[in-house]
Design a protein with these regions (language model features):
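A cross-family phosphate/adenosyl-ligand binding-site feature
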Residues: 80-89
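Acidic, Ala/Val/Gly-enriched low-complexity intrinsically disordered segments
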Residues: 5-10, 15, 33
């Protein structure tokens, strides 16, 4: 009936603003909570190399670090380069990044192209680097830092074929390179080494060594 329809419309008008406010409050509260702890944000792009992402995330979480998977596409699931779906924790538009946080870029050819195409992420990387914030990238992803000038004067490594995109960097053909606030690595086969390096940097060397032993690292 018309009376029922009007009653339902009145209900929508009264409840929807409350839901909207509640959602905004949750986001703000989440940002405030994140300010109180050092975070690692892994930026997930469609076409990313799944092992490079998850090996590093897994090791950091084992070490007790707070890690969130951030969708640069602002959607719940990331589709990896080999058809593996990965559930994200948060959207890029909703995160709060402190200078003490760490930003991590998994590689993959298509994934790296998507990282480079994300203007919001590019601005965040430049800003974070200017504050001395830690940034890590693996495989093709260091090239996303290179085109932004973040590797200028730094020692760095990457997947073969991307060396010319490490603008201003001194290329090192080794598995993992840390130079100041920037850590880079070569590819899927070095992803565990990258994870252990970040554990050493964010936690301590002893924790990194214990983790290496626990996972039977040769």
């Amino acid at each position: 009936s018309l009376r029922t329809v009007n009653a339902y419309n009145d209900f929508q008008k009264s409840v929807y603003p409350m839901l909207t406010y509640s959602s905004r409050f949750f986001i703000l509260r989440s940002k405030k909570e994140r300010q109180e702890k050092n975070m690692v944000y892994a930026f997930m792009a469609d076409g990313c190399e799944e092992v490079e992402a998850l090996a590093v995330i897994d090791l950091l979480r084992r070490a007790g670090e707070e890690v969130e998977l951030v969708s640069i596409h602002n959607k719940d699931m990331t589709q990896g380069s080999h058809g593996i779906g990965i559930k994200n924790d948060v959207m890029l538009k909703d995160i709060f990044v402190d200078a003490a946080d760490t930003l991590f870029l998994p590689g993959g050819g298509v994934g790296t192209k998507n990282l480079k195409a994300c203007e919001e992420l590019s601005k965040l990387l430049v800003s974070h680097n200017a504050k001395g914030g830690r940034i890590a990238a693996i495989c093709a992803a260091p090239s996303a830092l290179g085109i932004l000038g973040i590797l200028e004067g730094k020692n760095a490594t990457c997947y073969p074929g991307f060396e010319d995109q490490l603008k201003g960097a001194k290329f090192k053909a080794v598995p993992v390179v840390t130079d100041g606030n920037i850590t880079t690595s070569r590819g899927m086969g070095t992803s565990i080494l990258l994870g252990l390096e970040l554990v050493k940097l964010l936690k301590d060397e002893e924790t990194s060594k214990k983790l290496a032993e626990a996972i039977m690292m040769p």
